[in-house]
Structures are given as C-alpha cells and as structure tokens.
Design a protein with these regions (language model features):
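Conserved inter-motif catalytic segment of the P-loop NTP-binding fold
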Residues: 3, 10-13, 19-20, 24-26, ...
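Phosphate-binding/switch region of NTP-binding enzymes
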Residues: 36, 42, 47, 77, ...
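Gly/Ala-rich phosphate-binding loop of Rossmann-like dinucleotide-binding domains
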Residues: 57
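Conserved beta-strand segments of alpha/beta enzyme cores
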Residues: 99-102, 200, 309
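Hydrophobic positions on the alpha1 helix immediately C-terminal to the Walker A/P-loop
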Residues: 48, 52
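Conserved hydrophobic/aromatic pocket- or pore-lining residues that grip, position, or stack substrates
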Residues: 29, 37, 53, 76, ...
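C-terminal regions of RecA-like/P-loop NTPase motor modules
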Residues: 2-10, 41, 124-127, 165-166, ...
Length: 325
C-alpha cells in the first residue's frame, strides 16, 4: 500500500513544502540554479565576472550597492588565460581575496569536461557559493556536445543537479554565434537546450553610443521579473568600473547584516547564518570567523552557548544545528 502522499510512483504536490528562491544577486544569479552569461569575444564577460567574484570573495558590495555580507567562496575555472601571469594578477587588481577563490589545476588534472566528476568533487570539498566555467565551449568532451540536443540536455541536467544538491550558483560563460539579427536566445553557441536549462540568461553588448560602455541585459528569467540592466565601462585610464544600475530588490531578501554590541553577538549571528545552509567543517568555520575578526576562543564559547553539536566524519570535525539522530 502506498504511504501518505504517494500513489504508486507519484508524490502529491500537497505534500511538498514550498520554498522561496534564494539569490546570490537578485534578479540575475540564483543559488542552486544555472545562469548563462553570453556575449561576443572581447566584450568584457570575464572581466565583469572577475569583478563580481572579487566582491563576493571579500564580502564587499554588489553592483547595485547591496552588501554581500559574509565573504563567499568561489571556484573560477578558466581555460583561456594563464593562471599565474593573467588570472591571478587580474583577480588581485580587482581586489579579490584569493584565499576564497580556487580552481582545478588543469596541468595536473587534464581533460576536464563540463560534467566531469572532478568538478563535483571540488564543489563538495570547497563548498563554494559560486562556480564559474569560462568559457563553456572549452569544457566539452567534443565539439558536437552542445550541438546535439540530447547530449546538451544531459550535460545541463547534471550541472543543474549539482547546483541544487550542493547549494551553489553555477555561471556558464559562453560566446555568441555569428547569426546577426536573430533573437538573443538563439545566438548562444550550440543547442537551444543550453539556454532552456539556464534559469537566467544575461547578454553583454557594447553600448552603440559609447564603445567604452557595456550593457548587460537579462534576456531570460524563469524565476523572477526581468527588471533593470547592468552597465559597466572598461577604459585605459580607469580600468573596469560599475556604472549606476537600478535593480528591484528581492522581496524575500533578508535584512542586511545588523550592528553588533559585542564580538559574541556577532559570532552567534554568523555561526547561525553559516549553519543554516547545512553542516560545516569546524576548520572552515574558524577560518570564516577569523575573516570577520572573531577569535577561535570566542567562536568555541559561542558554540557552547548556542548548543551547537559537533561530530567526526571522514577524519574531520563538523558543526551542526540539527539534533542528533
């Protein structure tokens, strides 16, 4: 006999608890979902993303001025530039905290593909809030992978599952095809299944009235109203600069980090916020606390006050707010 909420292989929607979409950057990049950032080569896609990564990694501000809050970890996997002579200097120039930005070394782990199990393992170990693949075309098993509908669909389903299960946003950076005059959604390289799987599609274009300015338009949003556009400039004199952007606020957003009267009060807020996303290694929590000016001793005392339990798994200690089973 089927249990409550089930009829054979079916589950009733009445037994599903509805949850709000969580955003890394509303309404452009959602946590647990795939976002596609596309544009012509040289239009600043990677530069824009590196500047966003920098703000996330140091707990800075989003382009609309909203505070990031806690510093976030990011995996930035890029095959088009040298790690030591290009990517690292560019991240540093953007002001990134490179202790929170990682990559899979392709000199050691060659042949990396979009649905590679090593990417999943890296996500499990590093627990990033954002994973960026730049460009998507460089991480295909063969040139035809994005062209064949069935293969592209399976690739995207696998990535989407990783984003959901491991609670991170995945951004795929892609080049546009040369079909001028066609609708933006159909200018992505490869099968339309790639665009179909992405919950948000952002397209970078040059401002026709100012070659130094880029306009980022959201040409697809399956999770929220498409509202506003992003602008940034790239000049020899000033480098990269975010320009004014008017973006609607996430109606389900939490209030920004409050002011604290003591280190213990701040530690309690941060620990509860970190563990609300799931159990976390104690070593990682201590590191996050240190980044926020909280000592190990204060973190341990606060843990006791909050009744946080710890347990050992695979030779590592974890903290949890969940009751012991």
């Amino acid at each position: 006999m089927a249990s409550k909420g089930e009829t054979g292989i079916l589950t009733l929607y009445s037994d599903v608890q509805a949850t709000a979409v969580r955003w890394l950057w509303y309404p452009f990049i959602a946590v647990g979902k795939i976002t596609l950032l596309q544009g012509d080569p040289g239009d600043g896609k990677s530069t824009m993303m590196m500047n966003l990564i920098a703000e996330l990694s140091k707990g800075g501000k989003l382009p609309d001025g909203k505070a990031v809050g806690l510093s976030q970890r990011v995996i930035y996997q890029c095959s088009e530039d040298g790690v030591s002579d290009t990517i690292k200097p560019r991240l540093e120039k953007c002001g990134a905290d490179c202790r929170n930005v990682a990559f899979i070394n392709e000199e050691t782990y060659s042949g990396l593909t979009l649905d590679d199990e090593r990417i999943r393992q890296a996500i499990i170990e590093f627990r990033p809030r954002l994973v960026v693949i730049d460009p998507i075309q460089a991480y295909l098993g063969s040139d035809s992978d994005l062209q064949i509908a069935g293969r592209a669909r399976k690739l995207m389903q696998r990535l989407g599952m990783w984003a959901s299960v491991y609670d991170c946003a995945i951004v795929l950076i892609g080049h546009l095809n040369k079909k001028e005059g066609t609708k933006g959604l159909y200018r992505s390289l490869g099968s339309i299944d790639v665009v179909a799987a992405a919950r948000s599609v952002l397209q970078v274009e040059r401002d026709p009235e100012n070659a130094d300015v880029r306009i980022v338009r959201q040409i697809k949003n399956s999770l929220a109203p498409s509202d506003g556009e992003i602008r940034f400039s790239i000049t020899a004199e000033n480098g990269f600069q975010w320009l004014e952007c008017e973006i609607a606020q996430d109606p389900a957003a939490e209030p920004e980090t409050p002011n604290f009267e003591s280190k213990s009060e701040k530690a309690a807020y941060l620990i509860k916020k970190l563990l609300s996303e799931g159990d976390m290694r104690s070593r990682e929590i201590y590191m996050r606390m240190s980044d926020e000016g909280i000592s190990r001793r204060t973190a341990e005392n606060t843990k006791k006050e909050l009744g946080i339990r710890s347990y050992r798994k695979m030779r590592q200690w974890y903290w949890s707010i969940q009751p012991e089973e």
